[in-house]
């Protein structure tokens, strides 16, 4: 997630004026024109209609609620977003056959987003909890380096560890370290300020965001295709622009060409368990025949494709 500056709605503006009035008498000035006022939304959109519902779905599952419509809501969760949340939780191994798993219960006990909870639980198996705690803390706070730090999250991790090693005080890293420390305490893990493998950062990010595994597009060194089918771009001069594989931790939500904000390089050897063999049969609209292939894929990323002769037309997708 990222902080964005957006226009206020009319009801929010009125509410803030009222709050100021409760402190003391005075005058509230609206710092925009009447024309701008006329274009403002009348009311705020309820948060549940715009938010990622993964945390809510995990909460309800831990309470034994499988159908959100069995509850009374001021604004019911959109079914499209709810289905997407369940798919995310299934991919994070929190759900199986519509029920919460033991792994999901462990995720729910951690005070963070399910994606980060899954990452830290997997990091425990890899003996990388301290690194995962640093990653989670950095992702929960505003980027401490901003654009000057490039898109490599490893630059932030190294800066955080330097902050700790030199016992610096103040600044953005103080808050980030407090969060990281709280996660280390939950896992009873000692702080680690030693040099680390940047590819291990990428591996951990794939646990949190498996759909954001990204492969450099041939001939477009700064463009990457994600496992979810989207295309995202790094800056042409960025250190990671020429990496073959990235794990993307943060990018914008625009359709079409997205922009990568934070990522880490990936070792392709760490992706072996994610490769799936998929048989694809499609109708060729130009030739009027069937095209079939056996693909090795990571989501929408095709690693290898072998044509299949004599496809079965009953399996046309």
Show which residues each predicted segment covers.
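Second RecA-like catalytic domain
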Residues: 1, 34-317
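Conserved segment of the helicase C-terminal RecA-like domain
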Residues: 2-40, 54-58
């Amino acid at each position: 997630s990222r902080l964005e500056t957006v226009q206020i709605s009319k009801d929010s503006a009125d509410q803030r004026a009222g709050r100021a009035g409760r402190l003391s008498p005075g005058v509230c000035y609206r710092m925009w024109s009447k024309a701008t006022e006329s274009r403002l939304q009348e009311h705020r959109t309820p948060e549940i209609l715009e938010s990622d519902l993964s945390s809510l779905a995990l909460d309800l599952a831990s309470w034994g609620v499988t159908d959100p419509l069995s509850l009374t809501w001021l604004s019911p969760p959109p079914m499209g977003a709810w289905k997407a949340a369940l798919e995310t939780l299934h991919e994070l191994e929190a759900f199986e056959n519509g029920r919460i798993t033991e792994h999901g219960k462990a995720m729910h006990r951690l005070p963070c987003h399910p994606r980060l909870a899954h990452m830290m639980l997997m990091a425990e198996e890899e003996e990388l909890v301290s690194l995962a705690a640093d990653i989670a803390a950095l992702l929960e706070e505003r980027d401490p380096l901003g654009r000057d730090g490039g898109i490599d999250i490893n630059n932030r991790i190294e800066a955080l560890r330097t902050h700790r090693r030199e016992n610096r005080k103040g600044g953005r890293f103080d808050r980030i370290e407090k969060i990281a420390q709280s996660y280390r305490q939950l896992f009873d893990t000692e702080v680690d300020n030693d040099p680390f493998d940047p590819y291990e950062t990428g591996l951990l990010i794939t646990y949190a965001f498996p759909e954001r595994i990204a492969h450099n597009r041939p001939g477009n060194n700064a463009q990457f295709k994600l496992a979810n089918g989207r295309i995202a771009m790094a800056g042409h001069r960025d250190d990671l622009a020429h990496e073959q594989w990235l794990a993307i931790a943060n990018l914008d939500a625009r359709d079409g060409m997205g922009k990568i904000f934070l990522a880490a390089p990936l070792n392709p050897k760490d992706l072996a368990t994610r490769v799936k063999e998929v048989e694809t049969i499609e109708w060729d609209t130009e030739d009027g025949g069937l095209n079939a292939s056996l693909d090795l894929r990571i989501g929408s990323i095709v690693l290898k494709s072998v044509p299949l002769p004599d496809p079965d037309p009953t399996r046309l997708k």
